[in-house]
Amino acid sequence: MHCTGCWAAEYGHQLNLSLDDIDSIIRQGKELGTYMYIYTGGEPLTRKKDVIKICEMHPDCAFLSFTNGTLIDEEFCQDMLRVKNFVPAISLEGFETANDSRRGDGCYNSVKRAMELLKKHKLPFGISTCYTSVNYKDIASDEFFDLMIDAGALFCWFFHYMPVGNGAVKELLPTPEQRAYVYHQIRKFRSEKPIFTMDFQNDAQYVGGCIAGGRRYLHINAKGDVEPCVFIHYSNCNIHNTTLLDALRSPLFQAYHDNQPFNENMLRPCPMLENAGRIQELVKQSKAVNTDYESPEDVDHLLEKTVPYAKNWKPMADKLWDEQKK
């Protein structure tokens, strides 16, 4: 699957962490008090047997996987019922036309089949949706929320489109008015709809700003590079030759630690998207290197895409934040 504007597209698709690598990361994480682990792709369920094996090896942990849903079948549902510590979050970009225009023809119907199977077995699952300038009204509509609820979804992660990588499509970035629309709709439906929603970009107030850089979360890519965030493709270290604890002590992670929160306005939490120049400072200060192996992106090039967005979003963010504080 080749999704338009995918943030993971330029890592390359031939890299994988081994089962032993993943087991080691989890064992180290548990020593630090971490008992929840999230898989992202590519498509994590191409390794269904390993996913279930890890669940068996670590029954004291909870696991979630972002997935396109195409590989969820009867056998996998039975495995989920047996291990009881795995939950899928199925990617859905709106209704059929919007979804398949970004994720490929037929993907919407595959998602529907997966949700029907999960609901039949009374298995918990959620939805993951990326909102853009194209689909923002669809994913923030009564109809879309009701579709998720009727399908049996218990939660939905909402992700703002991120212009990461040389193949990013800047035109997919929502305008300030479009982002504000999503912001208001999600909050409105929280008091009206029986589904738990998390807006990764607009809910920073509940977690004190950016959670990346090991403050509450980090990302390890398929080659083992330890990154501050799934959207920040820069690193000083690799899990194959360092410990998780030492990765947290690496220059880039320490730069995050010393600078969070990146803004007192919790609607401007990200050092890349909403705070022009901050990610550039962090990367250059720490001498971190880009981890997009197929098409490396210089941090100055990344900055060129986000400076206009940050400038345009600031007045709207300040207005919304002031309204919240009243």
Spans of model-derived segments:
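Canonical Radical SAM [4Fe-4S] cluster-binding loop centered on the CxxxCxxC motif
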Residues: 1-19
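N-terminal pre-triad scaffold of radical SAM enzymes
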Residues: 1-4, 35-39, 220, 224
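Short cysteine clusters
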Residues: 3-6, 210, 224, 229, ...
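Secreted/processed peptides and extracellular or luminal domains of membrane proteins
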Residues: 9-12, 216, 235, 276
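Radical SAM enzyme [4Fe-4S]-AdoMet core and its adjacent flexible, acidic
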Residues: 61, 100-213, 222-223, 227, ...
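Flexible mid-to-C-terminal extensions adjoining Fe-S/redox cofactors in radical SAM and related proteins
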Residues: 231-326
